[in-house]
Design a protein with these regions (language model features):
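Phosphopantetheine-dependent thiolation modules in NRPS/PKS and related acyl-activating systems
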Residues: 1-39, 43-94, 98-105, 109-135
């Protein structure tokens, strides 16, 4: 299990989660766990998320997208608001081939994932990076 999924599972006090887990439907869901996820996103992943935005999130994939966008914004040196799940390599000037490789190299230790060499050409969007997490 990668670092992000483990963090979410720990906050939710469940054995494991997948990207498609609807986190509000986990056993024992309560406002304390919601607060725990908000704190985790901000403190552990550098992704401060307001309550209104948090209420829009449904799955662990949505939480992961928030964390990955904050991470990518730091690597690319762009505002978080300029990125979304659909943002692709080359769609903004800062996401060039060099920064694309930086995203791959820095995401692996940060998120505890491994992108096999043959998958890297397929990592075109933020959501592609998340979907390719090997768990």
């Amino acid at each position: 299990m990668n670092k992000f999924l483990k963090s979410v599972a720990d906050v939710l006090e469940v054995g494991s989660v997948t990207l498609d887990t609807p986190f509000r439907e986990t056993e024992g869901w309560c406002s304390l766990k919601a607060f725990g996820l908000l704190v985790m996103l901000e403190n552990d992943w550098g992704a401060p998320t307001g309550i209104d935005r948090f209420m829009e999130l449904k799955t662990v994939r949505d939480l992961c997208r928030e964390a990955f966008i904050a991470f990518a914004a730091g690597v690319l040196k762009v505002p978080r608001e300029s990125l979304s799940g659909e943002t692709a390599c080359g769609s903004i000037p800062e996401w060039d081939s060099v920064n694309h490789l930086r995203l791959v190299m820095e995401a692996e230790p940060k998120f505890g994932v491994s992108y096999p060499l043959e998958t890297i050409p397929g990592l075109k969007t933020v959501d592609d990076f998340i979907s390719a997490f090997l768990v």
